[in-house]
UniProtKB/Swiss-Prot annotation:
Protein name: Transposase for insertion sequence element IS232
DNA-binding region (UniProt annotation): 35-54
Family to which this protein belongs: Belongs to the transposase IS21/IS408/IS1162 family.
Domain Integrase catalytic stretches: 140-315
Length: 431
């Protein structure tokens, strides 16, 4: 398993509204802003540049925070499915908050606030309570190096460009302070895959956070945490946590509110569906890594930081990595093999195809969970299911190799399918 991070640091100022974010970026980089150059390029006065850099927003577009926002958590709890209390009217809720929580605002201001929040408005319009498992919950921040959040985007049905249906999973590990995250696409969610992924993610972070917040996934918890039971951590994962020096903090089953920071990237992973039928598995793997890099280089609205730059600040406060011998013991083993002249690699006396351009090159081989993963220079180039057949071709590999040897043949697609069918029958009879 390899994770490659491609970091770009260019930022284009197209208008005055870009200046606040530009100031944050330059602040992260500890670089001085050339206000005179900005004034010339945007064709405005230097004083205007100063004004926008200091947070000026044109009249009518300024986003004002409401003092009622401080009561968001209380309101969400009162209107949730866990609450036994019932509020038939907004006025009744306003009165309750005024009497019991010190709310100081007019009824009209309170009604307007509720109407601006769809999750609250539907309670009164349609009688729908806020589901506990999906409520926003308390917004809180953790100090640098303190916490990371772990989750899976599970069982994503994906159709490859060849028409094959695969169910893929994406693991996400996110540092809570910087919001820097690492994605990993895999068919498997096994414990060996999880621990190998986390090891490589820690290496990418440059250290280990003190706490890992997770749900009650079976690879971590033998028994789920509930409101009345602390849960039981799996022995092997407990040893992994001890070796790396972090504490496991499972969420209460069915109420993963404390894992809210990692939930937002899960929605971004829905971009995968826009490429249904367009990617091979290997191309999908590459897309997920590019998506992760893009998110890490984008301003985070909640923190006002760019995760990749905020990581530089957080890295110094992470715990040190354990010795390489410990880290290596959790990594999925990697073996170097050479691609033969037929564009195949060997595994246990059977051969598996790779793209034609890797013929004669040395590639990396990883085998786990009944799958073979082949890498070249940290890039996943092909994935095969382990088979008992002597020859195992991906149709697109065979087709390209055939087209190279028979460049003028009129219908390579049909010939490739016929040949592969014959090859399959020949070796099936020899088994």
């Amino acid at each position: 398993m390899y994770i490659k991070l491609d970091i770009q640091t260019e930022f284009e100022v197209k208008s005055l509204s870009d200046l606040p974010n530009f100031k944050k970026l330059m602040g992260n980089l500890k670089m001085k802003i050339n206000k005179s150059q900005l004034a010339r390029e945007l064709n405005v006065d230097r004083r205007t540049i100063d004004k926008y850099l200091n947070g000026f927003t044109p009249k009518g577009t300024k986003n004002k925070t409401s003092k009622i926002d401080t009561y968001y958590e209380v309101i969400a709890a009162l209107l949730s499915s866990d609450s036994k209390q019932i509020f038939y009217y907004k006025r009744v809720l306003w009165q309750y908050l005024t009497d019991n929580h010190g709310l100081k605002c007019s009824q009209s201001a309170f009604r307007a606030y509720i109407n601006r929040k769809p999750e609250f408005r539907t309670y009164f319009d349609e009688g729908k309570r806020i589901l506990s498992g999906h409520s926003v919950g308390v917004r809180y921040e953790t100090p640098p190096g303190e916490q990371a959040q772990l989750d899976w985007k599970e069982s994503i049905r994906f159709e490859t460009k060849s028409g094959e249906i695969v169910y893929v999973n994406v693991a996400v590990l996110l540092l809570s302070y910087s919001r820097f995250k690492v994605f990993h696409l895999n068919i498997s969610k096994s414990q060996s895959v999880l621990m190998s992924f986390m090891t490589e993610a820690f290496e990418m972070f440059g250290g280990v956070p003190k706490v890992i917040v997770t749900d009650n996934m079976k690879t971590v918890m033998d028994e789920a945490r509930t409101e009345h039971f602390t849960g039981t951590i799996n022995n092997k994962f407990a040893q992994f946590a001890q070796d790396f020096g972090f504490k496991v903090q499972p969420c209460i089953a069915g109420r993963p509110n404390t894992k809210g920071k990692v939930e937002a990237p899960m929605k971004l992973l829905d971009e995968i569906h826009t490429y249904q039928g367009r990617f091979t598995f290997e191309e999908l793997h590459e897309f997920v890594q590019k998506l992760c890099a893009r998110i890490n280089q984008t301003f985070h609205q909640g923190t006002g930081k760019i995760p990749v730059f905020a990581l530089k600040q957080e890295k110094n406060l992470l715990q040190p990595l354990p010795k390489s011998a410990i880290r290596d013991s959790y990594m999925i083993k990697h073996k170097l093999v050479k691609v033969n002249t037929s564009g195949m690699i060997s595994y246990k006396s059977n051969q598996y195809s790779v793209p034609a351009e890797y013929q004669g090159k040395t590639v990396g081989l990883q085998v786990y969970d009944n799958q073979i993963y082949v890498y070249h220079n940290m890039k996943l180039i092909v994935q095969h299911k382990i088979s008992q057949s002597k020859l195992n071709y991906k149709e697109e590999h065979y087709k390209k190799a055939l087209a190279k040897s028979l460049p003028k043949y009129p219908n390579i697609d049909n010939l490739a399918k016929q040949n592969l069918s014959v090859i399959g029958e020949v070796y099936r009879n020899e088994e």
